[in-house]
Amino acid sequence: GNTEPVFLTYKKNDVISRILDKTMKEKEPEYDFTGLDDTRHILWTISDEGDLDAIEQAFKKIDSLYIADGHHRSASAYKVGKKKQGGSACCGCTSGDAERFMAAVFASDELNILGYNRTLKANGLSGNDILKRIEEAGFSIEKLSKGEFPSEKRSFSMYLDKTWYKLKAESVDVPDDVVESLDVSILQKNVLEPIFGIKDPRTDENIDFVGASRGITELERRADSDMDVSFALFPVSIESLMDISDAGKIMPPKSTWFEPKLISGLFLHLFHDR
């Protein structure tokens, strides 16, 4: 079964928003608890048939649902569903179960996108070597008095040898492409791969990823302990995510950190045996 929903988003719909707002104001929540990470989770249910029908009709008019988190789970569910449709005994579940996966859907204006930051090994380079090679790659470098997240696109914060630096891609050749022009792509193509040897960030053991919700000090802690250098990135906009999807392209790996994050196990989609 599924214990964690795929995270979907859509362009705001006024009908759906009004019903959700009314439900939260007029009804008592079904669940209201605080998880182990001190995050509060509140869940309301909608049982009014008129509201449910209005939501269903509104979603029929929405052209696209965009995957914010759960691309691999969606692809896996699709493959399982195709096998079941072809009569393949790929699992012990009924055809209807296998052809569906669990999803949580949020309007785009209800999401908070945070930076998905990098911390990595220095690849045998000294601090001076790293600074020199980053400058040669076309970045300006400014020392900061304290750690801070970037405030604009094509700007990065780097923590190295207990010092924070602001990097700006001033002389970097940025392609006119919705994916290649993302900050995460600029950093990967011009810094992480050529300087640190990170060719595939999904599988390389010398890099790890830290959501901005954990704070700037977590990047310091990692670089001062099991890693050597950390990079903080400016968040990708929801508009960029939708533009990339509409263009038929795929977001780079580990490029977005979305909130709210539903706690795993809050919703279950069980597969029933044949």
Identify the function of each model-found stretch.
Residues 1-274:
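Surface-exposed, charge/polar-rich loops and edge strands
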